[in-house]
């Protein structure tokens, strides 16, 4: 099993609301608290976001209609993806899906044996092209949102600062993945990111400079392969399907 890099100590939020009973028709394999709490950017009143993946019963894939691939709930906010869908998202380096297997230990709420196996193969999902396309793509989306905000309105100004913080986070995570091969979910200096968010909300041109600087660093040789290695994910999914296969009862003679 791959040795997990040591993460800074992270305390889970005080008395988070309990997760509801499992809603998808399957078994949750891995689930944890993500978003601003994981990044270290949460503040009083911040939502607590949960992300996880589940295995639908294997027989559910044998009929005309495949099982639902995602289940989203509110109060609390939780998104669960079926195992195969999560793998497809992670192989494209989707930032939200990817962070699930890089969380600090204390933020996991469900971590079964197959979830542990997935964490052990997390590096195989990464690729230089995927990180560049996904992380820069999402950061650029945040930048475009900044340009359309009316910062004279206090609520819009607060949203602009939030978009700016996400932009900074995405760029820092992209560069760290490219240069170190490790997803920096927990930001080492959240206060600096908050301050940058406020600065960018007032001057979006600074975000453009950050985007350009990150792009330059991502253009340099890094430690990630050009393409992800799909073989570990494929083998893991076979184990998931085997573990959740229940043979149909024999027909009566």
Predicted regions and their residues:
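Long, intrinsically disordered low-complexity tandem-repeat segments
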Residues: 7-11, 15, 19
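Short secondary-structure junctions and interdomain/linker hinges
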Residues: 93-97, 174, 181, 221, ...
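Short, surface-exposed loop and linker segments with low hydrophobicity and enrichment for Pro/Ser/Thr
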Residues: 8, 24, 159-162
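A cross-kingdom marker for long, charged
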Residues: 237-253
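A broadly tuned "polar low-complexity/structure-edge" signature
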Residues: 1-7, 45, 248-252
């Amino acid at each position: 099993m791959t040795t997990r890099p040591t993460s800074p100590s992270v305390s889970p939020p005080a008395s988070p609301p309990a997760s509801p009973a499992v809603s998808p028709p399957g078994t949750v394999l891995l689930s944890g608290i993500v978003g601003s709490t994981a990044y270290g950017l949460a503040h009083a009143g911040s939502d607590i976001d949960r992300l996880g993946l589940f295995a639908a019963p294997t027989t559910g894939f044998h009929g005309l209609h495949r099982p639902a691939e995602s289940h989203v709930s509110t109060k609390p906010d939780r998104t669960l993806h079926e195992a195969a869908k999560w793998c497809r998202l992670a192989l494209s380096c989707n930032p939200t899906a990817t962070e699930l297997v890089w969380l600090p230990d204390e933020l996991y709420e469900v971590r079964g044996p197959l979830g542990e196996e997935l964490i052990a193969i997390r590096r195989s999902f990464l690729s230089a092209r995927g990180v560049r396309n996904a992380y820069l793509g999402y950061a650029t989306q945040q930048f475009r949102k900044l340009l359309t905000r009316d910062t004279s309105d206090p609520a819009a100004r607060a949203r602009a600062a939030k978009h700016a913080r996400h932009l900074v986070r995405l760029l820092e995570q992209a560069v760290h993945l490219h240069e170190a091969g490790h997803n920096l979910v927990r930001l080492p200096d959240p206060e600096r990111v908050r301050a940058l968010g406020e600065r960018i909300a007032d001057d979006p041109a600074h975000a453009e400079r950050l985007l350009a600087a990150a792009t330059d660093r991502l253009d340099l040789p890094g430690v990630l392969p050009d393409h992800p290695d799909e073989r570990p994910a494929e083998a893991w999914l076979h184990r998931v399907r085997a573990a959740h296969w229940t043979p149909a009862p024999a027909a009566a003679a």
